[in-house]
């Protein structure tokens, strides 16, 4: 895949722009950070050249001047919401985030529980857990009339009921495990609390997507819409920016909805607002670091198709209706892409049709397509991995990396001693067996050395993956999708 984004240019421009905004605001600046800070996989997929740690690398230049505050929506704890890219709960991700921030030398000691209600026992238990771990927790309540009733919100009956976070540095980065966590409300509540204490403070937003200086229906912006389809977010032209400057800028519905509150609040607290539009609030320089628009457009279209398959599988797993996948189907239409644009889909389906059993296909980074079929010894995903490694290592397809004699004892262990009904080897078992063989086989060693070259490859399977295969592909950095059907009919599914 062609590089479409200049990482180094971005880091330089972005840190400079944040410092310029700090000088403009004066006093304390609350910087709302949208998206993921140090593992932004979505951005790295739709902007080839953007590395998952891009944003944290940029913030490292300001490390000694900032502290990090993590917000989490109490309702997400009650819903047991998870990060799909890492397959961990938001609850665990808060702890993971703080650990990583601290390891990198950032000050991170505050968590804000937003929209907490007294009957949310899951969130209350998490609050106690955080406090036992030595973290400082502030509680923010559900405010009636938010975000429309500005006068109530900017009062003791609004932000006044929230607990105030005692920050110690003049740049406060507010982040969260995912969207809808209440980052903006946290910033506004803090500004209100600062004003009550005579502290000058302001707000700015660093949201990677949608990219304000790309067209509304640019595939990169549409990919963000697909990624947030469960929130029913939509990209829109910023009407305030258009009115103020007669210039079109891309924003999204929640920013536009809350802007009147932010503007009114800043006027009530400071006498005036520095911003005429939601776009003015932002400090995002991502669009200015795109160096190959065509490469980014193609990467974004592929991401939209992946999101569509993911929605179909999630709906099948959770036995939900097709609301989310239907929204993404509309986005696909706007972006001008279909499932046929994902080359591995047709190849995997061809394998299934010709064998009558589940099939799998991978597109290597140079465009070669490799398939895997289900056999008595191997599942199709495991077979595909072995075939892909042989292709990368230049090993003839007729060569067995693992002999039937080496596989059969593993099958016996699974079925006779470990209680498995499926004798076929999964991807993890195949890779362990290959690692053992590599000690005595130069061919196996060559194949194993190619594992790193699977990262970033696209894979499609004709049935929903089990948790083991799914986890292995995630760890390998493979971009996998599946048809929304199970290999066998059953009511109970082990996750």
From Swiss-Prot:
InterPro entries cross-referenced by the UniProt entry: DUF1846, DUF1846_C, DUF1846_N
Membrane-crossing residue ranges in chain numbering: none
Gene3D superfamilies: dip2346 domain like (3.10.630.10), Domain of unknown function (DUF1846), C-terminal subdomain (3.40.140.40)
HAMAP family xrefs: UPF0371
Family: Belongs to the UPF0371 family.
The protein's name in its UniProt record: UPF0371 protein Cgl2998/cg3325
Source organism (scientific name): Corynebacterium glutamicum (strain ATCC 13032 / DSM 20300 / JCM 1318 / BCRC 11384 / CCUG 27702 / LMG 3730 / NBRC 12168 / NCIMB 10025 / NRRL B-2784 / 534)
Taxonomic path: Bacteria, Bacillati, Actinomycetota, Actinomycetes, Mycobacteriales
